[in-house]
Amino acid sequence: MKFTGTKNYVSTEDLSMAVNATIALERPLIIKGEPGTGKTLLAIEVAQSLDMELIEWHVKSTTKASQGLYEYDAVTRLRDSQLGDERVKDIKNYIKKGKLWEAFDSEKQVVLLIDEIDKADIEFPNDLLQELDRMEFYCYETGETIKAKKRPLIIITSNNEKELPDAFLRRCFFHYIQFPDRGTMEGIVKVHYPKIKKNLVKDALDLFFDIRKIPGMKKKPCLLYTSDAADDLLC
């Protein structure tokens, strides 16, 4: 079971090696790189390539690590108890499984994407250390220990907005997706636009890389810019 890229995703040798090491050694993979370099898409394509379900956990600035485990709706349970609702007899009716619980609960191995982990509070990664190490967590409301039935393949993306804790990094593989060179970029364009003329690709890439070379540019154009340019050229 190896990943070498897909018909929709051009993977470099180094990136494929990182993914395959993660598969073989069952450690999370942290993917960093410029916005638009295909970090999130990698998880989607890995899942498709390996015929696994993809579970996506998109992290926001307000996201707490505990939300990946579960959320207990005590307010609704209190209200239902006041209304005499029979559901209050089973506390599980008020527990919403998080993405980590979903991944642990799957009968088959899944790909778990923890997307843009650096958006959350600095303690967020450390709060997941034990759960990712042991592949289990305790649900206080039900008194259950939730253990992973199959260890998920975990891919974590980061835009490098803030540094991740050393203790967390030590437990993961790491790969930085370098921005594609011209040859790799040509391959990416051909994958998505197989019928586009070579001279149009050359003109689009000349313009693209010239813009990226402009000194002092804070936000350089990403791969999506090339895709938009190719769409315009084909219109």
PLM features per residue range, with description:
Residues 204, 223-224:
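Active-site-adjacent segment of 2-oxoglutarate/Fe(II) JmjC oxygenases
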Residues 1-199:
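AAA+ P-loop NTPase catalytic core and its hallmark functional loops
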